[in-house]
């Protein structure tokens, strides 16, 4: 497979070792784009219910490099992240991570926290260096092949159980490589966001971190709506698009009537990372 730097790659890796006594596919999402957010110059697509609906199906229920649809996947258990700092600037990386995680927890209303012991975690997040990251990605994500990482900047993956519930995720960011290409923040934001259950890149989602042509590196208002939608209790893990459609439409109608769509821009710009970075 020939990779282009400006595109993402989604690969399903078969025959993985079992987790919780079961073997499930691991989805790998190399982050290959840099993303900054400017509402004034952006189409207000998140206000259009039909646009949001189509974007949701494409981001949550599709695989970029696989045929057909996939069932809905998300976390049901609390997300517990253990961060392994193997390079300098630990304080900076920790702060960037914690600020974005706080925002994700607020947007999704799903419990997400940083833990201090690896044994307590179901997400392993490694900050490393370029010379080590291929080997560490292979270990953290249990990869049999790492060829697809040669043109990637950073990577993440998750596993689901037979019901579609995400039970494990790994993230590996080679800091020197990401910084050299101006994509450290983009790696942090996109990788953890995608392993919440929105794995696919899509031209139908704009502005969005899931769209290669969006110049933003933080969550857009559309991303906020997509995350909220995914973690609505009415949408169950394992749902197909056919089963999800009437529920998605009902929720989006409610969002429009109660101001959720209209408030998405404000909620996106209230992210702690916006305050830190100075957007």
Segments predicted by a language model, with ranges:
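Metzincin-family zinc-dependent endopeptidase catalytic domain
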Residues: 93-189, 194-205
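N-terminal secretory signal peptides that target proteins for export/translocation
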Residues: 1-16
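Residues marking helix boundaries in flexible regions
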Residues: 12-14, 20, 29
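Short, aliphatic-rich beta-strand segments
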Residues: 80-84, 171-173
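Residue-level signal for short, function-critical loop segments
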Residues: 85-87, 177
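Disordered inhibitory propeptide/activation segment of secreted metzincin zinc metalloprotease zymogens
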Residues: 37-80, 87-89, 108, 153-161, ...
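Bacterial N-terminal signal peptides
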Residues: 23-34
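Metalloprotease/metallohydrolase-associated module, dominated by Zn2+-dependent proteases
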Residues: 148-183, 199-279
